[in-house]
Amino acid sequence: MSQIIWGAYAQRNTEDHPPAYAPGYKTSVLRSPKNALISIAETLSEVTAPHFSADKFGPKDNDLILNYAKDGLPIGERVIVHGYVRDQFGRPVKNALVEVWQANASGRYRHPNDQYIGAMDPNFGGCGRMLTDDNGYYVFRTIKPGPYPWRNRINEWRPAHIHFSLIADGWAQRLISQFYFEGDTLIDSCPILKTIPSEQQRRALIALEDKSNFIEADSRCYRFDITLRGRRATYFENDLT
Protein backbone atom coordinates (compact mmCIF):
# COMPACT_ATOMS: atom_id res chain seq x y z
CA MET A 1 0.00 0.00 0.00
CA SER A 2 2.78 2.45 0.84
CA GLN A 3 4.25 1.99 -2.63
CA ILE A 4 0.94 2.85 -4.27
CA ILE A 5 0.53 5.99 -2.17
CA TRP A 6 4.11 7.09 -2.89
CA GLY A 7 3.74 6.57 -6.61
CA ALA A 8 0.13 7.71 -6.97
CA TYR A 9 -0.94 9.56 -10.08
CA ALA A 10 -0.31 13.25 -9.66
CA GLN A 11 -1.79 16.30 -11.31
CA ARG A 12 0.58 18.95 -12.50
CA ASN A 13 2.83 20.14 -9.70
CA THR A 14 3.86 23.73 -10.32
CA GLU A 15 6.87 23.23 -8.08
CA ASP A 16 8.24 20.57 -10.43
CA HIS A 17 7.14 21.75 -13.86
CA PRO A 18 8.14 25.00 -15.55
CA PRO A 19 5.58 27.65 -16.43
CA ALA A 20 4.47 27.72 -20.07
CA TYR A 21 5.65 31.33 -20.21
CA ALA A 22 9.31 31.61 -19.18
CA PRO A 23 11.00 34.80 -20.48
CA GLY A 24 14.47 33.34 -19.85
CA TYR A 25 13.65 30.78 -22.55
CA LYS A 26 12.83 33.30 -25.27
CA THR A 27 10.97 30.89 -27.56
CA SER A 28 8.29 30.36 -24.91
CA VAL A 29 7.26 34.02 -25.16
CA LEU A 30 5.57 33.40 -28.52
CA ARG A 31 4.73 29.73 -28.08
CA SER A 32 3.04 29.86 -24.68
CA PRO A 33 -0.80 29.80 -24.82
CA LYS A 34 -2.62 33.07 -24.32
CA ASN A 35 -6.05 31.54 -23.65
CA ALA A 36 -7.35 28.81 -21.38
CA LEU A 37 -6.68 25.31 -22.65
CA ILE A 38 -9.53 23.21 -24.02
CA SER A 39 -9.72 19.52 -23.12
CA ILE A 40 -10.79 17.18 -25.93
CA ALA A 41 -12.13 13.75 -25.06
CA GLU A 42 -10.04 10.82 -26.25
CA THR A 43 -11.62 8.19 -28.49
CA LEU A 44 -11.18 4.45 -28.09
CA SER A 45 -8.74 4.26 -31.01
CA GLU A 46 -6.50 6.91 -29.47
CA VAL A 47 -6.12 5.16 -26.12
CA THR A 48 -5.88 1.56 -27.35
CA ALA A 49 -3.71 1.79 -30.47
CA PRO A 50 -1.29 1.36 -32.11
CA HIS A 51 0.46 -1.94 -31.40
CA PHE A 52 3.89 -2.13 -32.96
CA SER A 53 5.39 -5.28 -34.45
CA ALA A 54 9.11 -5.99 -34.33
CA ASP A 55 9.04 -7.37 -37.87
CA LYS A 56 8.40 -3.84 -39.16
CA PHE A 57 11.78 -2.66 -37.89
CA GLY A 58 15.07 -2.96 -39.74
CA PRO A 59 18.20 -4.45 -38.14
CA LYS A 60 19.92 -1.04 -38.16
CA ASP A 61 17.01 1.09 -36.97
CA ASN A 62 18.58 1.47 -33.51
CA ASP A 63 22.13 1.83 -34.82
CA LEU A 64 22.64 5.47 -35.77
CA ILE A 65 26.27 4.75 -36.60
CA LEU A 66 25.32 2.42 -39.46
CA ASN A 67 21.75 3.27 -40.49
CA TYR A 68 22.77 6.23 -42.69
CA ALA A 69 26.37 5.32 -43.51
CA LYS A 70 27.10 5.50 -47.24
CA ASP A 71 30.81 5.40 -48.00
CA GLY A 72 32.25 5.32 -44.48
CA LEU A 73 31.43 5.71 -40.80
CA PRO A 74 30.24 8.94 -39.17
CA ILE A 75 32.77 11.10 -37.37
CA GLY A 76 32.65 11.56 -33.62
CA GLU A 77 32.66 9.84 -30.25
CA ARG A 78 30.86 6.50 -30.36
CA VAL A 79 28.41 5.94 -27.51
CA ILE A 80 25.80 3.42 -26.44
CA VAL A 81 22.66 4.62 -24.66
CA HIS A 82 20.43 2.14 -22.87
CA GLY A 83 17.88 1.96 -20.10
CA TYR A 84 14.47 0.78 -18.94
CA VAL A 85 11.00 2.22 -19.43
CA ARG A 86 8.87 1.58 -16.35
CA ASP A 87 5.54 2.72 -14.98
CA GLN A 88 5.04 4.50 -11.65
CA PHE A 89 5.11 1.19 -9.76
CA GLY A 90 8.37 -0.01 -11.31
CA ARG A 91 6.69 -2.41 -13.72
CA PRO A 92 8.25 -2.72 -17.20
CA VAL A 93 6.51 -1.04 -20.14
CA LYS A 94 7.00 -3.51 -22.97
CA ASN A 95 6.58 -3.03 -26.71
CA ALA A 96 6.80 0.77 -26.40
CA LEU A 97 8.11 2.66 -29.42
CA VAL A 98 11.17 4.77 -28.60
CA GLU A 99 12.30 7.23 -31.29
CA VAL A 100 15.43 9.39 -31.07
CA TRP A 101 16.82 12.27 -33.13
CA GLN A 102 19.87 14.46 -32.63
CA ALA A 103 22.57 16.71 -34.05
CA ASN A 104 25.83 15.25 -35.32
CA ALA A 105 29.22 15.54 -33.62
CA SER A 106 29.57 19.10 -34.96
CA GLY A 107 26.28 20.15 -33.40
CA ARG A 108 24.38 20.29 -36.69
CA TYR A 109 21.06 18.66 -37.55
CA ARG A 110 20.31 17.09 -40.92
CA HIS A 111 17.56 19.59 -41.60
CA PRO A 112 17.35 22.31 -44.28
CA ASN A 113 16.53 24.97 -41.69
CA ASP A 114 19.69 24.30 -39.69
CA GLN A 115 22.23 26.79 -41.06
CA TYR A 116 24.82 26.43 -38.30
CA ILE A 117 28.37 26.51 -39.70
CA GLY A 118 29.18 23.14 -38.11
CA ALA A 119 30.12 20.54 -40.71
CA MET A 120 27.49 18.20 -42.16
CA ASP A 121 28.40 14.52 -41.86
CA PRO A 122 27.38 12.64 -45.04
CA ASN A 123 27.38 9.34 -43.13
CA PHE A 124 25.16 10.37 -40.24
CA GLY A 125 21.38 10.80 -40.40
CA GLY A 126 20.79 11.44 -36.71
CA CYS A 127 17.60 9.46 -36.13
CA GLY A 128 16.62 5.98 -35.01
CA ARG A 129 13.90 3.90 -33.42
CA MET A 130 13.42 0.75 -31.36
CA LEU A 131 10.89 -1.21 -29.32
CA THR A 132 11.27 -2.00 -25.63
CA ASP A 133 11.48 -5.71 -24.84
CA ASP A 134 9.45 -7.66 -22.27
CA ASN A 135 11.54 -6.09 -19.50
CA GLY A 136 10.99 -2.56 -20.80
CA TYR A 137 14.62 -2.42 -21.97
CA TYR A 138 15.84 -0.36 -24.93
CA VAL A 139 19.30 0.27 -26.39
CA PHE A 140 20.76 2.20 -29.29
CA ARG A 141 24.19 3.09 -30.61
CA THR A 142 25.08 6.52 -31.89
CA ILE A 143 27.59 9.35 -32.15
CA LYS A 144 27.61 11.71 -29.20
CA PRO A 145 26.04 14.98 -30.40
CA GLY A 146 27.95 18.21 -30.21
CA PRO A 147 26.75 21.44 -28.55
CA TYR A 148 25.57 24.27 -30.76
CA PRO A 149 24.80 28.00 -30.43
CA TRP A 150 21.22 29.17 -30.50
CA ARG A 151 19.50 32.53 -30.72
CA ASN A 152 18.10 32.75 -27.25
CA ARG A 153 20.40 35.33 -25.73
CA ILE A 154 23.89 36.53 -26.60
CA ASN A 155 26.41 33.70 -27.03
CA GLU A 156 24.27 30.93 -25.53
CA TRP A 157 24.92 27.28 -26.34
CA ARG A 158 22.77 24.18 -25.98
CA PRO A 159 24.46 21.33 -24.12
CA ALA A 160 24.79 18.03 -25.98
CA HIS A 161 21.39 16.34 -25.98
CA ILE A 162 19.27 13.73 -27.72
CA HIS A 163 15.56 14.20 -28.33
CA PHE A 164 13.33 11.21 -27.71
CA SER A 165 9.71 10.27 -28.22
CA LEU A 166 7.88 7.43 -26.50
CA ILE A 167 4.58 5.86 -27.53
CA ALA A 168 3.20 3.12 -25.32
CA ASP A 169 -0.52 2.22 -25.40
CA GLY A 170 -1.83 4.83 -27.81
CA TRP A 171 -1.09 7.86 -29.98
CA ALA A 172 -2.70 10.11 -27.39
CA GLN A 173 0.01 9.02 -24.96
CA ARG A 174 2.98 10.10 -27.06
CA LEU A 175 5.55 11.75 -24.83
CA ILE A 176 8.45 13.90 -26.03
CA SER A 177 11.51 15.19 -24.21
CA GLN A 178 15.30 15.33 -24.43
CA PHE A 179 18.10 14.01 -22.28
CA TYR A 180 21.59 15.28 -21.57
CA PHE A 181 24.94 13.70 -20.72
CA GLU A 182 26.52 13.55 -17.29
CA GLY A 183 29.54 15.81 -16.96
CA ASP A 184 28.55 18.37 -19.60
CA THR A 185 29.53 21.79 -18.25
CA LEU A 186 26.82 23.53 -20.31
CA ILE A 187 23.98 21.81 -18.46
CA ASP A 188 23.86 24.18 -15.48
CA SER A 189 23.63 27.26 -17.72
CA CYS A 190 20.98 25.91 -20.12
CA PRO A 191 17.95 28.27 -20.09
CA ILE A 192 15.60 25.43 -21.05
CA LEU A 193 16.62 23.27 -18.12
CA LYS A 194 16.53 26.30 -15.83
CA THR A 195 12.79 26.62 -16.44
CA ILE A 196 12.34 23.37 -14.47
CA PRO A 197 12.41 24.49 -10.82
CA SER A 198 12.88 21.01 -9.35
CA GLU A 199 16.51 19.87 -9.10
CA GLN A 200 15.29 16.27 -8.95
CA GLN A 201 13.38 16.67 -12.22
CA ARG A 202 16.36 18.28 -13.92
CA ARG A 203 18.69 15.49 -12.84
CA ALA A 204 16.19 12.91 -14.11
CA LEU A 205 16.91 14.20 -17.62
CA ILE A 206 20.64 13.46 -17.43
CA ALA A 207 21.96 10.16 -18.77
CA LEU A 208 24.52 8.74 -16.35
CA GLU A 209 27.88 7.39 -17.44
CA ASP A 210 27.78 3.59 -17.23
CA LYS A 211 31.41 2.49 -17.12
CA SER A 212 30.47 -1.14 -16.49
CA ASN A 213 29.14 -1.31 -20.06
CA PHE A 214 31.93 0.51 -21.89
CA ILE A 215 33.13 -1.45 -24.92
CA GLU A 216 36.91 -1.58 -24.90
CA ALA A 217 38.55 0.49 -27.64
CA ASP A 218 35.11 1.20 -29.12
CA SER A 219 32.32 2.99 -27.22
CA ARG A 220 31.45 4.69 -23.97
CA CYS A 221 28.05 3.95 -22.48
CA TYR A 222 25.32 5.99 -20.79
CA ARG A 223 22.20 4.81 -18.97
CA PHE A 224 18.93 6.70 -19.12
CA ASP A 225 15.88 5.19 -17.43
CA ILE A 226 12.39 6.54 -18.13
CA THR A 227 9.52 6.51 -15.62
CA LEU A 228 5.95 7.09 -16.78
CA ARG A 229 3.35 8.80 -14.60
CA GLY A 230 3.38 9.39 -10.86
CA ARG A 231 5.63 11.54 -8.70
CA ARG A 232 8.79 9.84 -9.96
CA ALA A 233 7.90 10.46 -13.60
CA THR A 234 10.48 11.64 -16.11
CA TYR A 235 9.71 15.22 -17.17
CA PHE A 236 8.17 15.42 -20.66
CA GLU A 237 7.91 18.68 -22.57
CA ASN A 238 4.45 17.96 -23.98
CA ASP A 239 2.83 16.58 -20.81
CA LEU A 240 2.24 19.52 -18.50
CA THR A 241 -1.20 18.63 -17.21
Curated annotation (Swiss-Prot):
Key words, A-Z: Aromatic hydrocarbons catabolism, Dioxygenase, Iron, Metal-binding, Oxidoreductase
Reaction(s) this enzyme catalyzes, per UniProt: 3,4-dihydroxybenzoate + O2 = 3-carboxy-cis,cis-muconate + 2 H(+)
Cofactor binding summary note: Binds Fe(3+) ion per subunit.
GO molecular function terms attached to this record: ferric iron binding; protocatechuate 3,4-dioxygenase activity
PROSITE patterns for the chain: INTRADIOL_DIOXYGENAS
CDD domains the record matches: 3_4-PCD_beta
Binding site for Fe cation: 109, 148, 161, 163
One GO process term, biological-process aspect: 3,4-dihydroxybenzoate catabolic process
Cofactor(s) of this protein: Fe(3+)
InterPro entries: Intradiol_dOase_C, Intradiol_dOase_core, Intradiol_RC_Dioxygenase, PCDO_beta_N, Protocat_dOase_b
Pfam families with a match to the protein in the record: Dioxygenase_C (PF00775), PCDO_beta_N (PF12391)
Pathway the protein contributes to: Aromatic compound metabolism; beta-ketoadipate pathway; 3-carboxy-cis,cis-muconate from 3,4-dihydroxybenzoate: step 1/1
EC assignment: 1.13.11.3
Role summary: Plays an essential role in the utilization of numerous aromatic and hydroaromatic compounds via the beta-ketoadipate pathway.
Subunit text: The enzyme is an oligomer of 12 copies of the alpha and beta chains.
Family, as annotated: Belongs to the intradiol ring-cleavage dioxygenase family.
Protein name: Protocatechuate 3,4-dioxygenase beta chain
Organism for this UniProt entry: Acinetobacter baylyi (strain ATCC 33305 / BD413 / ADP1)
Annotated gene: pcaH
